[in-house]
Amino acid sequence: MKKMLAAALAASMVMGLTACGGSQTADTKAPESAKEADSTVAGESTETAGSDAQKTGSEMTWKLATDAAKDYPTTKALVKFADEVYEKSNGRIAIDVYESSILGDEVSYMEQLQAGTVDVAKLSLGTLSGLYEDTQVFLLPFLFKNNTEMWKVLEGEVGTTVKNGLNDYSIQGIGFTDNGSRCFYTTTEVDSLDDFKGLAIRVQNNQLMNSMVSCLGGNPVNVSANEVYSALQTGVCKGGENNPNIILSDSLYEVAPYVLMDNHVTTMDVICMNLDLWDSLSDEDKEIVNEAMADATAYDREIWDDSVAESIQTLKDKGATIVEPDDATLDSFREAMAPVYEEYSAKYGDLLDAINEALGK
């Protein structure tokens, strides 16, 4: 089946040549785990929403899957979504939130979402772009200056296009949550373009991300997310990139104590529902879902920036060196990565044009 094969490709993509002439080796390890870029961490327990509703016999009980931990901002927002749906439906709809990859890694529960055995799921761009390739455009370096720009785009026609574009894969997008701005963490201090030359940098097994590192002069390395710490210890890689929350929670600062706050990619997660379930809902219930998701997104935006600020301060307290690049350095990064834009502008030109139009560029 075409749609399910597309999902499988997310786990087994083999990358070719990059825009800057480097090459990649497909990650043959286990699929990316909760620690993946896409900004999640492993946790321990399941947060159940609407449990009282189940006791009194809710008409519907949905499974919601995420690989994020219970105390991660995204999970807190998803629990709020579940609570809001339960309240707004007067207990007719209960949602069980299965966090910390209890239902499998993202690739696994994305397939379950398509099959209808999972009803709602949080999907990161690293996983989703293996299925819905157009979403890879959001991984372009420096596409957004900050998350304010990102939200401006997602709240308009572009966001609607992305959510509805998933229909071809038996999925309906229902909203977005913040996934932060990514920074480089390294074993030696990096504060200029020259410092990247020949440096082995771990990135997700994603063609665009590999191209980005190659353009900086580094060597992209693809290892499983749960092996990054040991890869840094053994010298397989000399750095990686993620948001400060993950750098802290995965203790990566212990073996790569230099954090370059370049914010080269600002990303989101997409909250998705099985398309058959969505189509089966009444207009009233669709409105309940939309309103609950809007409330959850607002809550996510409220707590995300504070969580990042707290993580940065904790990294400093634990001895990490936070490097703040100046404008000239950031300009040199943008110039070096121009070939990435050239390649992907041709590939995803229409969506990129819509993003730039929304930003007034």
What do these predicted ranges mean?
Residues M1-L9:
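Positively charged n-region of N-terminal signal peptides that target proteins for export
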Residues K35, T40-T48:
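Intrinsically disordered, low-complexity segments used as extracellular stalks/linkers
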Residues G16-A19:
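C-terminal motif of bacterial Sec signal peptides marking the signal peptidase cleavage site
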Residues G21-K29, V41, G50-T148, L166-K361:
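N-terminal secretory/targeting leader peptides
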Residues E149-K163:
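A gly/proline- and charged-residue-enriched helix-loop-helix capping module
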